[in-house]
Curated annotation (Swiss-Prot):
This is Small ribosomal subunit protein uS14. Gene3D superfamilies: 30s Ribosomal Protein S14, Chain N. It comes from Chloroflexus aurantiacus (strain ATCC 29366 / DSM 635 / J-10-fl). The keyword rRNA-binding applies. InterPro entries: Ribosomal_uS14, Ribosomal_uS14_bact, Ribosomal_uS14_CS, Ribosomal_uS14_sf. Its cofactor is Zn(2+). Disulfide bonds: none annotated. The lineage of its organism: Bacteria, Bacillati, Chloroflexota, Chloroflexia, Chloroflexales. Binds 16S rRNA, required for the assembly of 30S particles and may also be responsible for determining the conformation of the 16S rRNA at the A site.
Amino acid sequence: MAKKSWIVRAQRPPKFSVRAYNRCKICGRSRAYIRKFGMCRICFREHALKGLIPGVVKSSW
């Protein structure tokens, strides 16, 4: 879980546009962010296994 200060800092507009970065909407994690779903890999996996993300199925071959 990210610190509240980092989450708040990421939400406000940066002084320069290059400084903007993505954070997970659920936990605030900045690394392993999946743009299409707006969350980190850990939250993505949890939500996918619970069936909360439509169209995502676990792959097996």
